A protein has these predicted regions:
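Conserved GNAT acetyl-CoA-binding A-motif
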Residues: 25, 53-68, 75, 196-204
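A short, internal acetyl-CoA/4′-phosphopantetheine-binding micro-motif in the GNAT/acyltransferase core
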Residues: 30-37, 173-183
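Conserved acetyl-CoA pyrophosphate-binding loop and the N-cap/start of the following alpha-helix
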Residues: 36, 40-48, 184-188
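Amide-forming acyltransferase catalytic core, primarily the GNAT-like/NAT-type
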Residues: 79-169
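Conserved beta-strand in the GNAT
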Residues: 4, 10-18, 26, 31, ...
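Conserved active-site alpha-helix within GNAT-family acetyltransferase domains
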Residues: 39, 43, 67-85
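Short strand-connecting beta-turns/loops that link adjacent beta-strands
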Residues: 8-10, 20-23, 68, 84, ...
Length: 204
């Protein structure tokens, strides 16, 4: 659901709640016009967030913010959220990166059962979350099955990776997880993304 905050029929803030594969609530796009910050607009949007999460019976509510975005973190904590793991991101520009068709060989899309078998053991290594488009998905069976259904889980024997995009797939694909031969997986990720005309790869 997309929420708008209005003052005298003027849009001064917005926010979106998305229900993820495991039913948890993901809070995103929270923005308040500079002229209306620190006036309770963000708090009102959070009130709506919590109403929605209750109505959807979400087992958890999560969000992402930059480590230096203190106001965003403070507002979230004021509304009952607490700090989770911190992640660093890396980006690779694919222009002029060499790749070969042979790097695609052996990989196929995993089904839900395969995804669970391959990805669940990675929970601790991944810090409990797989990230796609700065959306952090809790590692659990429902997430694994949902990612497989979305076409994000590739496998080749004991090698596996989560690779895809929740939005703007023409610009950036995100590596959510890697298991097995790191070099082989990365070569596949680069080749697959480049084959589809994607501009960048990102990894948390």
């Amino acid at each position: 659901e997309f929420t708008l905050a209005l003052v005298e029929d003027k849009v001064v803030g917005m926010g979106k709640l998305t229900v993820l594969f495991d039913g948890s609530a993901w809070l995103e796009l929270l923005r308040v016009h500079p002229d209306f910050q620190r006036q309770g607009v963000g708090a009102k949007i959070y009130t709506r967030y919590l109403e929605q999460a209750t109505a959807f019976r979400c087992p958890a509510i999560r969000m992402y913010t930059g480590a230096k975005n203190i106001p965003s973190a403070a507002l979230a904590q004021k509304n009952g959220l607490h700090r989770g793991p911190e992640f660093c991101s890396m980006t690779l520009n694919l222009q002029n990166i060499p790749w070969e068709k042979e790097h695609l060989q052996g990989f196929c899309l995993a089904n839900g059962q395969q995804a669970q078998e391959l990805l669940l053991p990675m929970k601790e290594q991944a810090g409990g979350f797989f990230s796609i488009n700065h959306t952090f998905y809790a590692v659990n069976p429902a997430t694994c099955k949902g990612m497989a259904a979305a076409g994000w889980v590739y496998c080749a024997g004991e090698n596996a990776l989560v690779l895809g995009a929740r939005f703007q797939p023409e610009k950036v694909w995100h590596i959510g997880a890697i298991a097995g031969d790191l070099e082989k997986n990365l070569r596949f990720a680069i080749a697959r993304a480049a084959q589809c005309g994607v501009e960048q790869l990102s990894f948390h």
